[in-house]
């Protein structure tokens, strides 16, 4: 979500109306906001995100560690997921200091009930380094290149049908 998209309360009302119109559960949704936007426009973000969280929508902070990394917003905002920026992913396999920082972050997030997702995983070494420090959710080219919605639906249907016989 960009700052322009989420000026309260109109943004929250539009979101909830759209969710109601398509008939999905709010707890099945995750809104994603960048760390930079939280720091640069914190009051607008805070109002909108708190209202969305009250409605049951989960909040993910994207690109964590890329810029400001303010712990202040983690104490005020209803954060469900922290998505670790790919720059930290690149450093992790060979940088002991990066491993210690991220290891401490894992401990803190576990204590707060915040899940961590590693972004930009391209190599097995990066994946393995994250697994070693306790992060077991990630995304990146190691797992899949970007695909269209149509391709995703195709893949999910194929996966759902795998292993079943029609007779």
Name each model-derived stretch:
Residues 5-13, 46, 149-167:
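C-di-GMP signaling machinery
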Residues 1, 73-76, 81, 115-156:
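Cyclic nucleotide signaling catalytic output domains
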Residues 102-112:
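Alpha-helix-loop-beta-strand connector modules within alpha/beta enzyme cores
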Residues 85:
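Short helix- or helix-capping micro-motifs
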Residues 1-47, 120:
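Catalytic core of bacterial c-di-GMP phosphodiesterases, primarily the EAL and HD-GYP domains
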Residues 24-29, 55-58, 80, 110-114, ...:
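Short, well-ordered coil/turn segments that N-cap beta-strands
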């Amino acid at each position: 979500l960009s700052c322009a998209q989420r000026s309260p309360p109109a943004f929250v009302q539009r979101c909830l109306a759209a969710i109601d119109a398509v008939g999905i559960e709010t707890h099945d949704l995750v809104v994603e906001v960048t760390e930079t936007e939280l720091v640069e426009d914190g009051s607008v973000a805070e109002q909108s995100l708190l209202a969305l969280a009250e409605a049951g929508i989960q909040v993910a902070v994207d690109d964590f560690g890329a810029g400001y990394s303010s712990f202040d917003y983690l104490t005020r905002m209803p954060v469900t997921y922290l998505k670790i920026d790919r720059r930290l992913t690149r450093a992790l396999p060979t940088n002991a200091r990066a491993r210690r920082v991220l290891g401490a972050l894992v401990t803190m997030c576990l204590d707060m009930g915040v899940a961590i997702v590693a972004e930009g995983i391209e190599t097995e070494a990066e994946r393995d380094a994250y697994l070693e420090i306790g992060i077991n959710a990630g995304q990146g080219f190691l797992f899949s290149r970007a695909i269209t919605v149509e391709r995703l639906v195709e893949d999910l249907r194929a996966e759902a049908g795998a292993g079943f016989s029609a007779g």
